Design a protein with these regions (language model features):
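Residues in flexible loops and secondary-structure boundaries
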Residues: 24, 31, 41-42, 98, ...
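Short loop/turn segments at secondary-structure transitions that flank enzyme active sites
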Residues: 25, 29, 86, 96, ...
Length: 181
């Protein structure tokens, strides 16, 4: 859309278009937005970063919504609705096919069972859906997501709080090193 580029120098237009192309190479056609399609760590780590993290996907899809790429956004949100746990949260990360990915988060901390999640992934998915709505005003797409994504995730986020402080309960941090608030 030429409106996106009004008044911008050609060098910025080129960077914008190149950025969109690079983003698209990391997006599975079923909706998963992959952190990185690389194999650098396979040799030593026996794993890749070819996973969908809800946080990363939310930031990417928010930018794509602002750029007007609704078709990619809708696939991502449908993907999230499909993988959302029955209780309303996203796990740490998923394979592009929607299956739960290998996980290095413990399910037990100090002998107590915990959810191996990064709570912000669930919250940021709802935030990105709000950005999508603000950018594209596509309420017809959002309406069917109300019960199986929006309400379930919001109910989880409201319930996943300390009853005394009302702060969120602990979850794993951005770098997956600490389990805390």
């Amino acid at each position: 859309d030429s409106r996106q580029f009004e008044g911008l120098p050609q060098s910025l237009r080129d960077v914008f278009k190149r950025s969109l192309l690079i983003l698209r190479t990391q997006i599975d056609n079923r909706g998963a937005i992959i952190a990185a399609n690389d194999s650098d760590i396979v040799r030593f780590g026996k794993d890749t970063y070819s996973y969908m993290w809800g946080r990363d996907g939310a930031f990417v899809v928010a930018a794509l919504a602002k750029a007007g790429y609704s078709h990619i956004c809708t696939k991502y949100f449908n993907f999230c609705a499909d993988i959302l746990a029955e209780e309303g949260y996203l796990f740490q990360h998923y394979n592009p096919d929607g299956s739960l990915a290998s996980n290095w988060h413990a399910w037990l901390v100090d002998g107590k069972e915990i959810l191996p999640i990064q709570e912000d992934s669930t919250a940021l998915t709802l935030w990105a859906l709000w950005i999508y709505y603000q950018s594209l005003n596509d309420v017809e797409f959002i309406r069917p997501l109300y019960n199986n994504l929006i309400k379930k995730a919001a109910d989880f986020l409201v319930s996943y709080r300390d009853t005394q402080t009302l702060l969120p309960l602990p979850s794993y941090d951005l770098w997956e090193e600490r389990y805390a608030v």
